A protein has these predicted regions:
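Non-catalytic, topology-defining segments of multipass membrane proteins
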Residues: 1-200, 246-334
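Generic hydrophobic/packing signal
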Residues: 56-58, 111, 204, 223, ...
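Active-site-proximal inter-transmembrane loops
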Residues: 145-150, 209-235, 241
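C-terminal accessory segments of proteins
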Residues: 195-213
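Conserved active-site loop/cleft motifs that coordinate metal ions or position small ligands
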Residues: 237-239, 273-274
């Protein structure tokens, strides 16, 4: 019988953070809540910290540094660097480098650090628990970030910064609220665990659950419910084909608070050069995907060459019109 493949060794620190912390939260938060209770102020602050961490990951780590979707004032960059460190998802340099590799090699089980092809558990958090070769640091795709003084300051001092943001700041807040332990449990521990899994949903569920209106070349899906949970990151199929767009939700009614935050920052002079994909390119992607599906359906049926040729000819004529007009728009975009 062939020998069973040996799994890479567990990473102790990551195992404590991603397995131990949730278990502690599951046990300690309900116990403290039952015997001591949490104040309304503690719940409000937990939500504030959660959103500041989350938007710093989506608006800072992700759309600003990983994808260069816009430019930001130094004050905003420092804000993202500090509160992003509070999310305890590694430094900007490591996070953005991994994410760029994910986009370049999406669904490649050997090169995508959190490939959905290796299963829901692996893409959600399994990839961080063991020392997989696909997760090795390689900053050759992040030379621009290595020249960024704010990014490199945070990278060098990451342990100190994230410790202060996750322990020191909740401790000071707890002293101010008159309940140190309760604040550490709610604003510190539970907020951190929730923030982790909200982000992890994008790597996992957003590659398994939802629709693929813009491209079927990878596993990324659009999912409005996940967008609500993830500060607008749930329109993942769109994002994977137009990754440099500062928006994920392109329609006015789509929930994307990260987009709204970036736009507000632009109004305040804190952001500029927002990248917005032209509408005709979006329409072209939709048409390409619809045509590919229609062609597959024809081939799956009778294989009628006449129908297939007619479909291809009509598609070519229509796309030529799109290229000439370049302003085709059947829906309203922001």
């Amino acid at each position: 019988m062939p020998e069973k493949a040996v799994k890479p060794a567990l990473i102790p620190v990551n195992t404590v953070i991603f397995v131990g912390f949730p278990l502690l939260a599951l046990i300690l938060v309900p116990l403290w809540g039952f015997y001591q209770g949490f104040s309304a102020a503690q719940w409000v602050w937990a939500l504030v910290f959660l959103y500041l961490n989350g938007l710093s990951i989506t608006g800072g780590y992700h759309r600003l540094w990983a994808h260069k979707a816009y430019e930001a004032h130094p004050a905003l960059r420092w804000f993202f660097a500090l509160w992003g460190a509070g999310a305890l998802q590694n430094s900007i340099l490591i996070w953005a480098s991994d994410h760029r590799r994910h986009h370049r090699h999406v669904d490649d089980n050997e090169q995508d650090p959190y490939s959905a092809g290796r299963g829901l558990w692996f893409s959600h958090m399994g990839w961080m628990l063991r020392d997989y070769p696909s997760g090795e640091n390689d900053f050759s795709n992040a030379r621009d970030l290595e020249r960024d003084p704010i990014v490199m300051w945070q990278h060098r001092h990451y342990v100190a910064v994230t410790t202060f943001m996750n322990l020191g700041l909740p401790l000071l807040l707890g002293l101010a609220l008159g309940d140190v332990i309760g604040t550490l449990l709610l604003v510190g521990l539970l907020r951190l665990v929730v923030n982790h899994h909200v982000t992890f949903f994008i790597n996992s569920l957003a590659h398994f659950w939802g629709s693929r209106p813009y491209t079927e070349s990878n596993s990324a899906r659009d999912n409005g419910f996940l967008a609500f949970l993830t500060y607008g990151e749930g329109y993942h199929n769109y994002h994977h084909i137009f990754q440099n767009d500062y928006r994920n939700g392109i329609r006015w009614w789509q929930w994307d608070p990260t987009k709204w935050m970036i736009r507000l920052c632009a109004t305040l002079g804190l952001a500029s050069n927002l990248v917005k994909v032209p509408d005709f390119r979006i329409q072209r992607a939709l048409l390409d995907t619809q045509f590919a599906r229609a062609r597959r359906e024809l081939e799956a049926k009778a294989g009628d060459e006449t129908l297939r040729e007619l479909l291809e000819r009509e598609y070519q004529l229509f796309t030529e019109s799109v290229n000439q007009w370049r302003a085709l728009q059947s829906e309203r975009y922001e």
